[in-house]
UniProtKB/Swiss-Prot annotation:
This is Large ribosomal subunit protein bL28. Belongs to the bacterial ribosomal protein bL28 family. The keyword Ribonucleoprotein applies. GO terms for molecular function: structural constituent of ribosome. Coiled coil: none annotated. Keywords: Ribonucleoprotein, Ribosomal protein.
Length: 99
């Protein structure tokens, strides 16, 4: 399991710890990842995703998982999230035609 957010693509960065004497030692900056269950309104299902805390705030800000995925570009999404996005697009298109 890699340390990458499934919704934003946020991953591990590397850098230096810098002491007061300006000594540098390598370190890793890890993303704040959480296992969360998000509900898709269009598909009426729950999905368990590994997302960063910042992505979770963005999902809430945009109005839920469906709205976030529809607005997100496919390049930053994981393969699971891309598949989920395509299913949501298909379901909303079917609902628009039926209405």
């Amino acid at each position: 399991m890699s340390r990458v957010c499934e919704l934003t693509g946020k991953a591990v960065l590397t850098g230096n710890n810098v002491s007061h004497a300006n000594n540098k030692t390598k370190r890793r900056f890890l993303p704040n990842l959480c296992q969360v269950t998000l509900i898709s309104d269009a598909l009426n299902q729950r999905y368990r995703l590994r997302v960063s805390a910042a992505a979770l705030r963005s999902v809430e800000h945009r109005g839920g998982l469906d709205a976030f995925l529809l607005k997100a570009s496919e390049t930053e999404l994981s393969m699971r999230a891309r598949l989920l996005r395509r299913q949501i697009v298909k379901k909303t298109a079917e609902a628009a035609v039926a209405a």
